[in-house]
């Protein structure tokens, strides 16, 4: 239970699903929920949707039902494990939690981690910021701090791309995680022809989607709604459905894996509709709430 609770620190509050599992597994889940409820906030326990696999505390997959390429984070595996992070350059695109995902991955991953951007980003509180074109300074900073942020100072306190090429940075750090997109703080996005700005030699691209946009008018929830209309055939006065959001992602096909963030804002059935719409096109989907509480 203690291990489960520690692993819960960034995980979904809402998506702690109880399916058909052993008595021991249920007791572990219920104990973790009780402890988290006592320390932080109320945890909503829902039933595991059909055909969705569940990650146990041991890291194994346990389900008596068929599994699909959809993973629901219940707090027992790190997000970096669910995303199957690999060393090298990872680009994070989309909307509804990109920056929070970068911070969580930096804290979870073992090895040196360099956070940066190919567009613009705000510096991370508590993470050393390095502005340099000297790769040896980068190596020394990583050896000292393990996790650093790099970029070029720009207007409004933001950072733009670093002076050094991403491929050079990848030789210095185990993981280079790049925020490669902007979204105007909206939960959903359609990409223009010049977006996203994915670095050369990127090994994995993760697309973040904000579930809080489901059920809202497209023009209010989607960055570049005119492109969303064009790619999905949605009516200009329509609302965002899980199927339309998935259709937009499929049409663009920019990512290897999709993170449905803000999952506590929708029902399990809505989340399932989104994942089911994507899985037939070969996407892996992780449903979670990026609830970063440790600073």
Predicted features by range, described:
Residues 157-170, 181-281, 293:
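Conserved catalytic-core segment of NTP-binding enzymes
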Residues 92-93, 113-118, 149-152, 176-180, ...:
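General beta-strand structural signal in soluble alpha/beta enzymes
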Residues 106-153:
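N-terminal phosphate/diphosphate-binding loop that engages ATP/GTP or pyrophosphate donors
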Residues 79-109:
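Walker A (P-loop) phosphate-binding motif
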Residues 15-18, 29, 35-38, 55:
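Short hydrophobic targeting helices and cationic amphipathic motifs
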């Amino acid at each position: 239970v203690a291990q489960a609770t520690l692993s819960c620190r960034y995980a979904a509050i809402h998506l702690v699903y109880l399916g058909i599992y052993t008595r021991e597994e249920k007791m572990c889940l219920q104990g973790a929920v009780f402890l988290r409820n006592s320390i932080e906030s109320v945890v909503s326990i829902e039933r595991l949707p059909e055909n969705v696999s569940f990650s146990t505390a041991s890291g194994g997959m346990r389900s008596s039902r068929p599994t699909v390429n959809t993973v629901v984070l219940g707090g027992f595996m790190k997000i970096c494990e669910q995303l199957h992070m690999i060393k090298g350059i990872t680009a994070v695109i989309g909307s509804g939690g990109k920056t929070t995902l970068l911070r969580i991955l930096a804290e979870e991953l073992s090895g040196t981690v360099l956070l940066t951007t190919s567009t613009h980003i705000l510096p991370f509180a508590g993470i050393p910021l390095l502005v340099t074109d000297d790769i040896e300074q980068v190596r020394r900073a990583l050896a000292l701090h393990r996790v650093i942020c790099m970029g070029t100072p720009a207007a409004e306190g933001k950072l733009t791309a670093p002076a050094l090429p991403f491929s050079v940075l990848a030789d210095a750090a185990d993981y280079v995680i790049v925020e490669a997109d902007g979204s105007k703080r909206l939960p959903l996005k359609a990409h223009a022809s010049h977006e996203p700005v994915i670095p050369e030699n990127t090994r994995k691209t993760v697309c973040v989607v904000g579930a809080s946009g489901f059920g809202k008018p497209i023009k209010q929830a989607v960055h570049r709604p005119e492109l969303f209309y064009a790619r999905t055939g949605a009516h200009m006065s329509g609302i965002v459905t899980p199927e339309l959001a998935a259709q937009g992602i499929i049409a663009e096909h920019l990512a290897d894996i999709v993170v449905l963030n803000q999952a506590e804002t929708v029902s399990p059935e809505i989340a399932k509709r989104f994942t089911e719409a994507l899985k037939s096109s070969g996407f892996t989907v992780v449903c979670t709430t990026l609830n970063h509480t440790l600073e």
